[in-house]
């Protein structure tokens, strides 16, 4: 009797073990399927375009825009439909506010066209304003209520492009405004100045808030996190003057960390919740007496610690987007393919485009990517949708 009970208990144990194993296998398979669906890259819409000099997306990624080599500005709606097309002489850059409610167009570093043009969502021109000096940089606030440009005469202009009564304020910076942005809470404007290199923050009326000093002649491209808690500065570096650099400030202008990269062509993004910074860059390595370009992508935590780095001679990643949680990084190989990498640098998904990838810009949450490819098409990509 005792022997029979032992056999029965052993059989029951084996059955439970088998069921548990089957359940775990199903759970793993489900998680893999869920991850594949969450991290997949798909084409949302596409539209034929000519050669572009600028790509832009609104906050939230609902509206997209381009400027082509002829100065034609084209704005697209959420479904990819062309909403309007306007020729703006000398245009090189377009910026779009959330929901497409205002569009800012200007010609960068052009002494002939020192004008800023504002359009409504329907393409009607609201206002054209001549500024003092060449335009160096521009920004639109996330709520669409303000726009800003900096000029070579060290001015910053902050506009309120109201269709009935447009107005602006301007004040002088302590150097040329190389890059400018609005904080995502729409309450402040931050400029990175050249020559007298520093970050300077003001309220929308021009009242000084704080400054952070930098070494002379630094030119930082600025990015703000969507939670308004941090600001990322990037020096891309060039082949002739390598030495790319990252700087990470808190919302009060305190420098939290900096990272010098032995390379050039750096592009970096900060995650919406400020936990991660991703960067791709190129560097020269010597192989058999020849200089060869090697590319890498790296992800850092908010305290500056390196999480992972991937790349090399046989895989040259270019950063395209960073997911909201920092769980994945989307890169291209500089040719036809797009990859989604997880926190360990493992490939989650891949998509091959019909033409070589020429330009790319992402939404602030990393869920949409606008591409111009060599096949003559403009693509809006969705990540995990």
Label every model-predicted segment:
Residues 59-60, 98-99, 142-143, 184-185, ...:
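Residue-level detector of Asp-centered blade-edge/turn motifs that repeat once per structural unit
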Residues 109-113, 194-195, 238-243, 288-293, ...:
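Short, solvent-exposed loop/turn segments at conserved positions within beta-propeller repeat blades
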Residues 51-56, 90-96, 134-139, 176-181, ...:
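Repeated scaffold domains used in trafficking and secretory/extracellular systems
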Residues 46-50, 85-89, 129-132, 170-174, ...:
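Surface loop/turn motifs at the tips and blade-to-blade linkers of beta-strand repeat domains
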Residues 354-385:
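Blade-level signature of beta-propeller repeat domains, shared across WD40, Kelch, NHL, RCC1
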């Amino acid at each position: 009797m005792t022997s029979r009970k032992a056999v029965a208990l052993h059989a029951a144990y084996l059955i439970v073990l088998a069921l548990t194993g089957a359940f775990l296998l199903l759970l793993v398979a489900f998680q893999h399927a869920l991850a594949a669906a969450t991290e997949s890259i798909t084409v949302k819409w596409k539209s034929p375009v000519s050669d572009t000099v600028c790509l832009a997306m609104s906050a939230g990624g609902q509206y997209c825009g381009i400027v082509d080599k002829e100065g034609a500005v084209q704005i697209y709606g959420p479904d990819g439909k062309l909403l309007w097309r306007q020729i703006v002489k000398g245009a090189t850059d377009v910026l779009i506010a959330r929901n497409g409610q205002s569009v800012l167009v200007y010609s960068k570093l052009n002494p002939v066209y020192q004008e800023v043009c504002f359009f409504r969502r329907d393409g009607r021109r609201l206002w054209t304003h001549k500024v003092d000096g060449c335009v160096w940089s521009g920004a639109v606030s996330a709520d669409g209520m303000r726009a800003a440009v900096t000029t070579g005469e060290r001015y910053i202009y902050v506009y309120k492009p109201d269709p009935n009564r447009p107005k602006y304020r301007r004040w002088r910076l302590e150097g040329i405004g190389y890059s400018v942005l609005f904080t995502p809470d729409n309450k402040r404007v931050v400029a990175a100045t050249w020559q007298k290199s520093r970050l300077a923050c003001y309220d929308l009326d021009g009242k000084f808030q704080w400054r952070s000093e930098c070494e002379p002649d630094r030119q930082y491209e600025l990015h703000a996190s969507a939670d308004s808690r941090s600001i990322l500065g990037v020096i891309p570096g060039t082949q002739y003057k390598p030495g790319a650099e990252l700087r990470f400030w808190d919302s009060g202008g305190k420098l939290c960390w900096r990272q010098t990269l032995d390379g050039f062509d750096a592009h970096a993004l900060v995650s919406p919740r400020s936990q991660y910074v991703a960067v791709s860059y190129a560097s020269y390595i010597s192989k058999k007496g020849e200089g060869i370009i090697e590319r890498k992508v790296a992800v850092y935590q908010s305290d500056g610690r390196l999480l992972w780095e991937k790349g090399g001679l046989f895989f040259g990643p270019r950063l395209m987007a960073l997911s909201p949680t920092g769980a994945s990084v989307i890169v291209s190989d500089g040719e036809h393919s797009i990859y989604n990498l997880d926190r360990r640098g493992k490939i989650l998904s891949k998509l091959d485009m019909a033409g070589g990838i020429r330009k790319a810009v992402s939404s602030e949450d990393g869920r949409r990517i606008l591409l111009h490819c060599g096949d003559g098409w403009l693509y809006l990509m969705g990540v995990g949708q």
